[in-house]
Structures are given as C-alpha cells and as structure tokens.
From Swiss-Prot:
This is Pyridoxal 5'-phosphate synthase subunit PdxT. The gene is pdxT. Its EC number is 4.3.3.6, 3.5.1.2. Pathway: Cofactor biosynthesis; pyridoxal 5'-phosphate biosynthesis. It comes from the Bacteria. It comes from Solibacter usitatus (strain Ellin6076).
C-alpha cells in the first residue's frame, strides 16, 4: 500500500487522510521532518496559507518540504495550491514555487461566498480516472490567474482552471477531500 503524507500542521488534513484511505493509500500525518522519509508523495491541504507558512517556519519544516517537492510528487488543495504556486497575489506571499502558475488568494470572495459547484472535468482527467462531473467545494478559494507552458488544465469552473497538473504535481483550488469522490486523490496516487 502506498504511503502518502498529509502536512498536518493546520487545515483539513484529517479529511485528506480519509480520502486517501478511500483511494487505497495509507495516510501519514506529517508533523516532523523525519516523516518525510517514510512517504512517497505529500499533500498540502486546504486551510489558511499564511498560518501554514508561519507553522512551517516555526516547526522548521519549510526547507524540508521544499526539498521533498524538488524530487517527489506533491498535491496541493486550496491553501496548498497557494503554497505550490510560483506566484501569489492578493497579497503577495512566500510559497514553495513548485508549479508554474500564479494564484490570487481568496479570489472567489469571503467565507460567506463559499460554494459547492458541479465541475465538468476535461477528457484527459476522465480518461485517466472515470467519467462524470466533480463536486467542487470552494472555501475562500484561490483562482489560478496564469499558467505557464507545461501546465495541463484538467478541469475549469467559470472559465478559470481549478484542477491542474505539471509533471509530478497536482493542484486543486477546491477541496476534493470533502466529497466521497476519490478520483482526484486516485489521480495523485498514479503519480507515485
């Protein structure tokens, strides 16, 4: 069984653990650098990106997670997507810069503007997983404002990319872990 880490300093890491189990993987809740040696891939969960950055620095994990991402698969959702982006606006902030995208934080609005939407994935996603719409939970979600060459869009919402991949990296601006649909997590497992 594949072991996948979920950064567990803040955010919805428990929901990702359950989603990984549904997808057939063993979650490892990463709170210490030594745990990075036990996993094949890492999920950066949703939560609050500035808080995660502070905790990564406080726990002295930032550089270790960055190093992990230089050689291993990483999947970021919502705040995790922000942490993976090369560019962050509204406001600008530090990130791991793993994926050639620029994101705007909280671009769908405030907490009260959060929503659940049905998203039609592109054929490339469906061909590699299964057909059907994705239930996308957007909670103060970022919008991907720019993508560079080599980034593949797998699903969009209102014309904006919401699920992308670049090589071993997967990014969702929504929360697939908050639904019973394990296809996005299964796609990540295929990168391990």
């Amino acid at each position: 069984m594949k072991k996948v880490g979920v950064l567990s300093l803040q955010g919805d890491f428990a929901a990702h653990g359950a989603a990984l189990e549904r997808a057939g993987a063993q979650p490892v809740f990463v709170r210490e650098r030594e745990q990075l040696n036990q996993i094949e891939g890492l999920i950066l969960p949703g939560g609050e990106s500035t808080t995660m950055l502070k905790l990564l620095r406080y726990e002295d994990l930032f550089d270790d997670v960055a190093e992990f991402g230089r050689t291993k698969p990483v999947f970021g959702t919502c705040a995790g997507a922000i942490l993976m982006a090369k560019g962050v606006t509204n406001p600008a902030q530090e990130s791991f810069g793993l994926v050639d995208i620029e994101v705007e934080r909280n671009a769908y609005g405030r907490q009260t503007d959060s929503r659940i939407a049905q998203v039609r994935p592109f054929p490339d996603f469906e061909n590699r997983t299964a057909p059907g719409e994705l239930k996308a939970v957007f909670i103060r979600a970022p919008i991907i404002r720019r993508i560079e060459d080599g980034v593949r869009v797998l699903a969009s919402y209102q014309g904006d990319p919401v699920l992308i991949e670049q090589g071993r990296f997967l990014v969702a601006t929504f929360h697939p872990e908050l639904t019973d649909d394990a296809r996005v997590h299964s796609l990540f497992l295929s990168k391990l």
